Structures are given as structure tokens and as C-alpha cells.
Amino acid sequence: MLFVIVVALSYLLYRSLTDPYKAVIAEQEMTENVRHRMELVRDALVLYNSRTGDYPPTENGLTALVEWVKTDSLIATQADSLFAFLPPDTFNADQLIVSPRTGASFTYTLNDTLRPNVYLLEDPDSEDQIGDLRRTTMLNAPNWN
């Protein structure tokens, strides 16, 4: 009887130590995945700017970016290698602008009153962002480095 109690308490102790650690590791992996997806959106915005000469407008800008990725002849043929998702996810252009954490779309704002134009790409579920609406030196720069 005492042996069973010792084994049960040992198991509970083991779980109380490993479960929080596993949760922290899972959260770190999710943060890495979200940041990678944001970097892919940044890469798509840079390609969009280099091919069209401008960034997409604020209103429906990310939707326009996805449509451009799907329809631009050069980008569409190479999209799965240019914008490779982290495993186990596989590339889907419609999921490019979606946070893997909650499924919410990233937010995008363009400031076209500055030269060069600057944008802000934000994750709705964290403080992570790429770019800045006021400082041109932060163009394409993530805030987590």
C-alpha cells in the first residue's frame, strides 16, 4: 500500500515539474512561429514594393497582398519556396496574413505621408511588430531583435 502511495506521489511530483516546462516550451515555439509568419509578410511586402513601386494601401492592404502573391506570375510560381511556413504547416497564400497563435489576421497600416513610405505590421495577440509609422529607420525592422 505504501509503495502505491509513493509511486502516485512521485508521478504527481514529476507532472508538477514537467507540465509547466512543456507549456513554456510550447509558448516559445508558438512565438517563434508567429514571428516567422510576420517575417514572411514583411518579405512579401518588400517584394510587392520592389515589383510595383509602392506598398499596398492601409484599407484591405493585406488582402491585396495575398491576391498579389497568388496572381503575380513570378511570385506565384515560387511562393511555396519564398514563403515557406515552419513545419508542420505548409504554405497557403490565404494563411500568410494570419497569426498561427489564434487565427486572427495581422494588422497593417501604411503611412504614405513620409518618404519613403513606411508601414506598421502588428500581431494582434502580442506586442510584436515590424516597422514603424514615424521613423523611416525602422522600415522592415522587427521590434523583437
Annotate the PLM regions.
Residues 15, 30-32, 93-98:
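Short linear motifs at secondary-structure transitions and domain/linker junctions
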Residues 47-145:
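Low-complexity, acidic interaction segments enriched in glycine
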Residues 31-52:
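N-terminal alpha-helical signal peptides/signal-anchor transmembrane segments
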Residues 15-22, 38-41:
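Short amphipathic alpha-helical segments, especially helix-boundary/capping motifs
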